[in-house]
Every structure is written in structure tokens, then in C-alpha cells.
Swiss-Prot record:
pH-dependence annotation: Optimum pH is 9.
GO biological process, one term: methylation
Pathway: Alkaloid biosynthesis
A GO molecular function held by the record: protein dimerization activity
Note: Present and expressed only in cultivars containing gramine (e.g. cv. 5172-28:4, cv. 5172-39:9, cv. 5175-50:20, cv. Hordeum vulgare ssp. spontaneum accession 5, cv. Golf, cv. Lina, cv. Barke, cv. Sultan5, cv. Igri, cv. Salome and cv. Osiris) but not detected in cv. CI 16145, cv. CI 11506, cv. Mona, cv. Morex and cv. Maythorpe.
Pfam families named among the record's database cross-references: Dimerisation (PF08100), Methyltransf_2 (PF00891)
Protein name per UniProt: 3-aminomethylindole N-methyltransferase
Organism the protein comes from: Hordeum vulgare subsp. vulgare
Record's keyword terms, sorted: Methyltransferase, S-adenosyl-L-methionine, Transferase
Activity modulation notes: Repressed by sodium carbonate, sodium bicarbonate and K-phosphate.
Amino acid sequence: MDKISAPFFSGTSPAAASVAGVDEDDRLCFQAQELMFAYNISMVLRAAIQLGLLDALSAAGGKALTPNELVENVETSSNKAEAAAAVDRILRYLSCFNVVTCSSEAAGPDGTLVRRYTTGPLCRWLTKDRGDGTLSPFAVFVVDPDHLFPWHHIAEAVTAGGPSAFERTQKWPYYEYMGKNQRLGTLFDNAMAQHSVILVTKMLERFKGFDGVQRLVDVGGGTGSTLGMITSKYKHMTGINYDLPHVIAQGLPLPGVEHVAGDMYESIPTGDAVLLQWITLMLNDDEFVKILSNCHNALPKDGKVIVVDGILPENPDSSLTARDAFTLDIIMFVLFKGAKQRTEKEFARLAKQAGFTGGIKKTYIFFNFYALEFTK
């Protein structure tokens, strides 16, 4: 896949570019300041989603709305004029990042500007699910205070060693904590479910590796929604949704899908293909090889594992695709001890170590995700 240029934080600050006489020193200072305040966009985006502003603009069907019109459906204890002024400031900020589009016109004898807003290019992925997934639950989840707290302890994780920053601060491994914090766990489940809809929808369009598969085992498949999407297209296929007992207890009744409880570190049900979707980056190398070895034992001759995950570039650069990959890698560093994104060479080495000698076939899916087929 070709590298995609970054729309902002790209080395040429949009703010700096609009000011006459900006020299190189100015430009670098602008860029450093943008990095300092990068959290702003995530937090303001979360607020806009929670307030329903982006959904309201989407529902308007292209009609430009004023802040006064938008706050009519926002429950607030403040007066509407005050709320409208706050909404205006939120949306004009988001318009700087192509989330919404802003237009203005003079109104009244004093020439006061009235701004109107419509959806911007990025709203496509940040409004309510239209059947092909949305990132809005993820945008709310990732900056939730309970999820964000460990990020204040990255330096401590480096100097002290031992557990990840998340486990150090929250006192439990990531998934165990999600089970104990039901509020955050629900946000996490919703975020992952919608992310999976996006990914699997694109995978079914672009990936042909399920052709001929009769029995597909989805390891860590959650409630089975991914398998349900796959088996709805591949009617001949039987899907085995494999996850921990408390997860399988919430399994969805889906045609062609059988729910099986177990532990992927112990064994994996037999099938002619095994799917590992967005799991491998959460594993250290020893865990990854252990699970791949269990997959190898569950497969017939010429069976395959399908890993759906990102691929880390050999070297970092400023492209959007590289930044995305290294962003996920640093997220794994904060959340899980030893977990990481991997280069294609690292995938190949670990697959061979687990007994897969048939090589790797790579297919690009969508937003930096690939399907990697390891053949036995």
C-alpha cells in the first residue's frame, strides 16, 4: 500500500502556513506547540460526540445549521445562548481538522458573524453506525479518564520496569480490569464491535482467503459477530467462535456459528483455517508463538492461520500510515507488557518458529490492516 500523507502535524503547520513572514524557526515552534496540545482534538471530538453534535449535522442532510439550532436538542442546565456559544467554539475548532465544515455570514446592523456548520469529510466515520461501522464509540472510549490515567505513568514504566503502565496504575492486567470496571468494559466492547464491523466489511470485499474454507475457527471472537458476517457471505462455511467462558456466555445466536469456550493458551478447536483478528499486537513474542503453535496443532496439512492486524514499517517516517502503525505500537507498550506491532519480517520469523513453513501471503484490507496467511 502506498504511504498516505498526514493531514496535520505533518511538518508544515497549517497555522504557520497562513501567517505571512513565517520563517523556519517559527514553523518549528508552531509544530512543537501542535504536538504539545495534540490531546485537545481527542477531547473536543469526544465532547462533540457525547453532545450529539455530529449526529445532528449528519441528520440535517447537508443543511447548514447554526449553533443556536444545534443546542435545541442538547439537554443543558445553562441558558441556551451560553450553550450555543460553547457549541460554536467546539465546532469551529473541529472545522480546522476537517471534522465539520464552517461557513459564516454577517447578520444584523452591527455585522456580527453568524457561523453555520455542516458535516466535514471525517464525519463519515464519526457519526452513528449506518450498517458499515463507526469509530465514534472508540473516540469516546480511548480518552475516558479510567483508560487515559496510565498514560501519565509512561516514564515510570521505563525507569522502574516490570508491569505495563496500565497494570501498574490500575492494579490489574488489561482484560481483567475491563471485566471489573463494567462501565469502561461496556465502552470497550462497543468500540471493538464497531471497529470490527468496519474491518470485516472491507475484508469481505477485498480478501479472498476464505474461499474454499469449510471450517473457520475465530480465536478470541467475542460474541461471534465477526463470524456471523463471514458465514453470511460464505454459506458453505461452519464457524467456530472460540473465546473464554464468560465471553461465550454472551454469544449471539447466529446461523452457521457454533460457540466453544476455552483458553487459546491451552488449545484451539480443529478447523481448516484459524482467524486471529486484531489479537497478535496484544501479545508478547512468547505468547504469540505459543498460540500460533496451538493453531498449527489444530490445522490439517495445508491448513492456514489468517492474522488480521497492522504491519509495522521497518523505519519510522512522517506519513499517516507510519504514524498510525507506530501509534498502535506505543498504545500496546502502555497497555500490555511485551505487546507490540510487528514488522513483516518479525511475523515471518515467529510463524516459522511455530512450525509454519509455507510462507506468508499478504493482502491489504483497510486503514492500515492486512490479512496475513500463514500456511502449514
